[in-house]
């Protein structure tokens, strides 16, 4: 287009290109639900929730940890763990090559990050799935890191919060992956016997072996609005039963209505609500927010959550 303009009006194409190059890339983002064009700095300030339609966009595991935990006194748990291709698995691509490409793309060694820290002064361990790493699938490293996070809770009397975003068990690790379902469930049973709270926060999406194990084993099962949660996907179910599924089937609002969830919390409510719940469950002092007036002001500025949001 610029070459065509250059021929008709000399200098026009070059000027247009120069002007375009001054606009930073990635400054705007389109909402995948309502198609609103959003200014990225404002979107990030709103915790990656669309101010127009309240759509909760998918975020990285570290971004999740950053907006949930307090800024000080954080420590990553088992960052040294790396996956291994024990089965020498190959489908259309070698598993080893998939691991390398996903590690480069995400900056993570595997699909789970774990930190101990505080939420408004309440001591916790928080783990979050990285969906962009092989669909957040659960393999040996994910299971081991989850168990190590549980062990920190047992050693230091902390609550555990898990933010799930996963397609399920990692097929490239076969039975090793399926074993993680039992391994993580057994670790959570020890937490339960010790009376330490485990809060599962399901984000979009949660499926397969993760939804069938650690994601649904919380003392409180929480979800973000409109998250897709289930075992098999809705299209697979429709093809199997050959029936049209109800509107909103497998969305968090549908699950809450039918008793599969305890509550739905919008992203800007998670820190305050969960820290208050944990402090009551563990009989700890009330959470300490730095400036109560600023907190209330922030909440007033943020858009109202949709219906069915606690």
From Swiss-Prot:
A GO molecular function held by the record: carboxyl- or carbamoyltransferase activity
Domain named CoA carboxyltransferase N-terminal: residues: 27-296
GO CC field: acetate CoA-transferase complex
Keywords from the named record: ATP-binding, Cytoplasm, Fatty acid biosynthesis, Fatty acid metabolism, Lipid biosynthesis, Lipid metabolism, Metal-binding, Nucleotide-binding, Transferase, Zinc, Zinc-finger
Subcellular location(s) of the protein: Cytoplasm
GO biological process: fatty acid biosynthetic process; malonyl-CoA biosynthetic process
Keyword check for Lipid metabolism: yes
Signal peptide boundaries: none
Cofactor requirement: Zn(2+)
Keyword Zinc found: yes
Binding site for Zn(2+): 31, 34, 50, 53
Family membership noted in the UniProt record: Belongs to the AccD/PCCB family.
Function: Component of the acetyl coenzyme A carboxylase (ACC) complex. Biotin carboxylase (BC) catalyzes the carboxylation of biotin on its carrier protein (BCCP) and then the CO(2) group is transferred by the transcarboxylase to acetyl-CoA to form malonyl-CoA.
Protein name: Acetyl-coenzyme A carboxylase carboxyl transferase subunit beta
Species of origin: Hahella chejuensis (strain KCTC 2396)
